[in-house]
């Protein structure tokens, strides 16, 4: 953990470190504040405190959904290649994602009875929009990663043989060469700041596909029908947002640390990207494929062992998210071990 955070604060000004400390302080304060509101609202209703704990747990769980992590980790690496420190990428993504859920919760609380039929109709359209936006984005990420992987592998081989390190070869995606680079450059040109993840998070949330989001909406509907005041019901989405923002922010900070270590030296940068870029492409393809197949199975009512397995994977994105965290962590650790055992740092690089 400390090595990762050290990687984020590479410059001597101390600003990244101060920003991380401030970010954690704000998130902790937000989490504490949300719980204080819950205690104040439900102090005479211990059952509702249990429901509040459930909403918070839903946020913590939803933060590690596979589509969240794949989008955050890949965009973090892209912004790191642009020379930025996107430690708030995960925060902005989660805020965009949760804002849709919060808005829906408010609408449901206001119109608990009349909105239910409309919610079903919106789910039909929203699920298609949200899933397609998520899957297409991840497929584009996978294609871009494969372009970067090809460029990094060629540059690494040349440098190891005593050749000259050419930065433009590594950054093929952002140069003027390459067919896929020209196709997908507009997509990544849009995301040039951490806050650009906010609208992307909103797109990912439109479908209300996951059990966590549906459960939170169900909680809002249930409590509204019981006569719980609107401001008290808002505690549930606030807790959901607090939990999700905390975990997604931690993820982007950890990824910044891993990528910062890799970019300290040209050879290290090339070697690391050959390993982590390959994993990123595979993860993006798998997650995007699962989402697309799940959408096809749902809309065309496809049955069978294969489609049942696809449905199970879509219903358990949380578990898949933990697998992704493990894959990225193991890949990063193994790349460091192999890199040091082979003494790649001792390679002379001619720029």
Swiss-Prot record:
Report the locations given in the UniProt record: Cell inner membrane
Q: Does the keyword Transport apply?
A: yes
Write out the topological domains of type Periplasmic: 41-51, 116-128, 221-243, 291-316
Which Gene Ontology molecular function entries are recorded, alphabetically? nickel cation transmembrane transporter activity
How does the protein's chain sit in the membrane according to the entry?
A: Multi-pass membrane protein
The record places the following residue ranges in the Cytoplasmic compartment, namely 1-19, 73-94, 150-199, 265-269, 338-351
For this record, an example GO cellular component is: plasma membrane
Q: What is its main location?
A: membrane
Write out the transmembrane intervals.
20-40, 52-72, 95-115, 129-149, 200-220, 244-264, 270-290, 317-337
A single Pfam family it belongs to is: NicO
**Matches recorded under InterPro entries:** Ni/Co_transpt (IPR004688), Ni/Co_transpt_high_affinity (IPR011541)
Keywords, alphabetical? Cell inner membrane, Cell membrane, Ion transport, Membrane, Nickel, Nickel transport, Plasmid, Transmembrane, Transmembrane helix, Transport
Q: Which PANTHER family match?
A: HIGH-AFFINITY NICKEL TRANSPORT PROTEIN NIC1
Role of this protein: High-affinity nickel transporter responsible for nickel uptake. Necessary for high levels of activity of hydrogenase and urease. Does not transport cobalt.
What family does this belong to? Belongs to the NiCoT transporter (TC 2.A.52) family.
Quote the protein name from its UniProt record.
High-affinity nickel transport protein
Task: Specify the species.
Answer: Cupriavidus necator (strain ATCC 17699 / DSM 428 / KCTC 22496 / NCIMB 10442 / H16 / Stanier 337)
């Amino acid at each position: 953990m400390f090595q990762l955070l050290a990687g984020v604060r590479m410059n001597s000004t101390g600003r990244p470190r101060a920003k991380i400390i401030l970010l954690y302080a704000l998130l902790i304060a937000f989490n504490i504040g949300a719980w204080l509101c819950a205690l104040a609202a439900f102090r005479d209703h211990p059952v509702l405190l249990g429901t509040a704990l459930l909403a918070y747990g839903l946020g913590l769980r939803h933060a590690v959904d596979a589509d969240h992590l794949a989008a955050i980790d890949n965009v973090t690496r892209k912004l790191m290649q642009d020379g930025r420190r996107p430690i708030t990428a995960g925060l902005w993504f989660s805020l965009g994602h949760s804002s849709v859920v919060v808005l829906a919760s408010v609408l449901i609380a206001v119109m608990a009875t009349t909105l239910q039929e409309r919610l079903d109709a919106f789910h039909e359209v929203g699920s298609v929009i949200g899933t397609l936006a998520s899957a297409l984005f991840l497929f584009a990420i996978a294609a871009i990663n494969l372009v970067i992987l090809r460029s990094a592998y060629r540059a690494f081989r040349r440098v190891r043989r005593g050749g000259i390190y050419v930065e433009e070869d590594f950054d093929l995606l952002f140069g003027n060469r390459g067919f896929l680079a020209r196709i997908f450059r507009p997509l990544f040109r849009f995301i040039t700041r951490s806050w650009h993840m906010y609208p992307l998070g909103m797109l990912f949330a439109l479908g209300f596909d996951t059990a966590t989001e549906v459960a939170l909406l169900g909680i809002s509907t249930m409590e509204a029908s019981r006569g719980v005041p609107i401001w008290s019901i808002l505690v549930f989405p606030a807790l959901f947002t607090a939990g999700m923002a905390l975990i997604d922010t931690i993820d982007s900070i950890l990824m910044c640390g891993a990528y910062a270590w890799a970019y300290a030296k040209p050879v290290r940068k090339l070697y690391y990207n050959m390993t982590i870029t390959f994993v990123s492409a595979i993860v993006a393809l798998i997650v995007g494929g699962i989402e697309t197949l799940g959408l096809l199975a749902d809309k065309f009512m496809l049955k069978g062992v294969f489609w049942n397995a696809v449905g199970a994977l879509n219903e358990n994105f949380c578990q898949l998210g933990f697998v992704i965290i493990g894959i990225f962590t193991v890949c990063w650790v193994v790349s460091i071990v192999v890199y040091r055992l082979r003494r790649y740092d001792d390679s002379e690089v001619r720029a």
